[in-house]
Structure formats: structure tokens, C-alpha cells
Amino acid sequence: VENNLYGVDLDERAVQLTQIALFIKAMQLKGRRGAMPTYTHVVSTHFELPEYSKVKGAFISGSDWNETQQKTIHSIWEDLRAAYKFGSLIRVEEQLDALLPVDSSDMFANQWKADMFDFKHQMITTLRNQVHQWTGEGSNEYSLAKANDSITFLDILRTKFDVAVANPPYTDSADFGAELKDFVSANYYKPLKFNSNLYACFIKRCCELAGDDGKVGMIHPMTFMYIKTFEDVRKYILTNTHINLFVEYGLSNLFGTVMVDPAFYVLEKDGGTKNNDSLFISLDQYTRTPQEKYKKQYCLEALNDIVTKSQNKHVYQLPQSKLKGIKSYPFIYWISDEFREKFSDKLLDDVVDVKQGI
């Protein structure tokens, strides 16, 4: 709990409940594990920071930072000010990495990297001090807790994890408010588009937070599997990760009385796994049928059969490279290779002009 688990949420109450649950679990394991944890790294982003003009002097005083570096500091501070709205979608390390030279063969590249390391170290140190100062003003326990949360949050944004998991919010781009729309456009629109739904942004963010050999676990609506507007999301997954396991669960009351339409999956960033087959579990065919209530049972049986290397009619196995064989990369995993090859043939549109009418 103290050294391996980290978490971020906008909702302060959700964070408090999670902290309580972790302590209860720790109490249950105390007999086997020994000492109880004294704190957690599960934090809320419900803290506020002042306008940059009030802290600008602390950042640039005595520094020789150029205009680009100063703009980066300003941008990062403004993003942190919006943490209570955007949470872990804020990208600190990525903005700093953008200052590094693209061409590593450049004769000055190593010097630039050394200068950037010094800049990052100095900037982060000042940033931590300023965040702690402004969020921790006052001696009351709540202010001090918020100060610690803000520093932990900043550390989380700069850390690479072995595993990153999320059950992200589901908000269609048409329902983005003006602020969220601008934030997503600035951070998750180029070079690939992750702006179709808020959960798509979290797919990208979790992959960024996971280390080079890390894993990503997600659960969210399965709309991204086929729809054209999620093409870049699928392209990113197939290009940058390996699909270890993917469950197409479909509409169900997976979370009690709330009906959801989820897919859940595990991605691996380890390049050595990309040649391994991907495993898919298909359960959506039971949606709105008498067998719908058995989905959970079928899923658990399929997972067990995967572990024991037994046959299961719900499990499909294939190299994920085959998913690239159809235009826009839909996650169509259940068709035969022969049928898949037909998608590489000429389209009717390529041969004749299709017209309406007789």
C-alpha cells in the first residue's frame, strides 16, 4: 500500500472510500504481512492553485531559461491549476520531453539533453515547493492533507508504472463542455485522434503512464472496437502495444443495477510480446438472449480454460497483426483467414460507379 499502489480521482469522496477499503484490506492481512500502512498514495485532485503571475517570480528568479522553457513552465502550471477538472489526463513529463532535440545524431544533442535534465530538475523542485506552499497555507489538517495530495499527484504524473489500470469516465465528444473540448484538442488530438470519447483519452494516458515493459488494464464501452471515429485509437493500440487478452462482454448489469456495454482488456508494452497471439473472449452474442445471465460464468470458464490450455468455444486466438488487414483496423477477430483476405480485394467502388436507382 505504501510502496506499490497509486491512484488518482477527481472525486474526493471516492478517494476517501478507496483509502478506507485499502486500510480494511491491510487489517485483514495484518496477521500475515506484519505492520499496518501509515498512509496511501491514493489522492484526490481536488486542490486549487493561484494564477501563474503570483508564482512566476519564484520560477524565473536567478534562472537563465529561454522563452520556450518559460512558456513550458507556464503551460504546466496552468495544467496543474486545472487538475481538479482534468485529473490524471494532465501531462507534465510529456511537455518537458517535447523540449528535447528530435535528432539524436545532432552534434549538440547530448549537451541539450544535459541542459534539459538540469532544467527539469530545477523546474520540478521549484514546482513542488510552490504547489506545497500554496495548497498547504494554514496549519489546519485539511490544508496540509491537500498539500501532500498535490505533491503526490505531481509525483504520479512523472512516474512510470509496471501496471496502469482504469475504469474511465464515458463522455462523448458532443457532450464535452468548452473547457474540456479545448483541453482534449490541445493534448489528445495530434498526431493521433483520441477525442471521440473521454475514455479514449484515458487509453492513451494509461499507456503513457505504463513503463516500457508495463501493462495496461482497461474497462469501458466497446464502441471503440468498430466505429470509424476511433480508428486512430485502434491504430495506436495495434502499433504500440500487444493485446494480451480482450473480453467483448457486451450489454449487461456487470456493475449491479447499472446497465453498461463494456469491453475489458490487458495490453502489454513489452516489444518482445508483439509476436505472441492475442486472445479474445466473445460474449456479446448472448446480449438480450435467455443466456445473458450466464455471461459472467462463461467468462470465468473461458479464462480458466485459457490458463489450463483447454478448448473453449468463446475463445479466439490470432496474431493481432491480422486485425490490420481490414481498412480502419476494426477489432474483427472471429472471421476466418480466407474471409479476411477478401477485404484486401478491390472494392465495388473501384470497379464501377455506384449510382442510386435502376
Feature locations, PLM:
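Signature of N6-adenine DNA methyltransferases within the class I
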Residues: 10, 15, 19-40, 44, ...
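Class I S-adenosyl-L-methionine-dependent methyltransferase module
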Residues: 1-154, 158-159
